[in-house]
Amino acid sequence: MEQREKMFSEKGNWYKGNLHSHTTNSDGRLTPEEAVLAYRQHGYSFVCFSEHDYYTDTRKQFDCEDFIILPGLEASAYMFDTTGIEQMPEGISLEQGYVDMTMENAKKLLQQGFVPNRIKTHHIHGILGTEAMQKAAGDKVFRENEYVPFCVYFNQWDGREVAQKLSDSLKERGCFTTYNHPIWSRVDMEEVRDLTGIWAIECYNYDTVNECAEGQDTVFWDAMLRRGNDIMGFASDDNHNGGVFPDSFGGYVMVKSEKLDHENIVSNLLSGNYYFSNGASITQWGIHNNKVYVQCDGAERINFICGGGIGTSKTVMAENGIALTQVEFPLTGRETYVRVEVHDMQGKTAWTNAIT
């Protein structure tokens, strides 16, 4: 593994952001204006409005000295079980295998009473990348307020191929990509673990944590890391603000950056100069003299999660109610990667990315 003494840059400030958010531009309940006001009032510095299959860029409207928008979208592919449906709606044939469906056509089908069972989905973010990524995409960069058709498959699909094509198509348009809420999406491990070129996987989704207890998972992430997939993780809200349960201000990233602007925030996300959390904090971590260490504001337990042989991981727990603020863990050399989880005294968690 790489010997990196400090994973977070010494220069810069910490900026809090939500990378997964929905407004009235898709199926959210808050207008973009209401969402920006709410997140600014709660100490956030940036938000990505990731509307379903709809790319928006509201930077001109909302960017200011202490808050910015990351343009993006949440692109979709679905597999439907059509068992029991006697006749498909006009224009759709099971022999096609799949259709590229616009939101307008989907609404028409619903009006016709077509309610298939959605058995699997891939939800993949495309977030506008760096200036270099946009330049490489040329005239393929997303236009403001652009709808993207979503793929609908009937009864079967090659899940890995579908996800890979979806991610690749977003990257071709100047975006970096994330794989969202795999447990909620009902996907199998083999459909995800060998995906390439995806920046991060969503390990904590506040909305589905509260909706159905299917929003927190690191098993998919570790499975990818164990196979040599150099992928990062992130936490988010995926807020829709429907009012039935809270889904804002619960999952976020903390990015270290010298400036609060699109280029710097995105560059620091891509380089791993951040941690993600649902309430706990981490101030620094790294590897020094073959020991991995972490500094935090006070933890009840700290997990060092390692790839490699059985028994390489370790947990350190606070004793006699005295919170942990700095812990180190000697490495054996057998580890293929290491990442850290900090659980604070209030039961909240912060996650680092992996050193590989």
Spans of model-derived segments:
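Charged catalytic cores and adjacent phosphate/nucleic-acid-binding surfaces used
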Residues: 1-19, 33-36, 64-65, 81-92, ...
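A metal-dependent hydrolase metal-coordination microenvironment
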Residues: 2-176, 180, 187, 204-216, ...
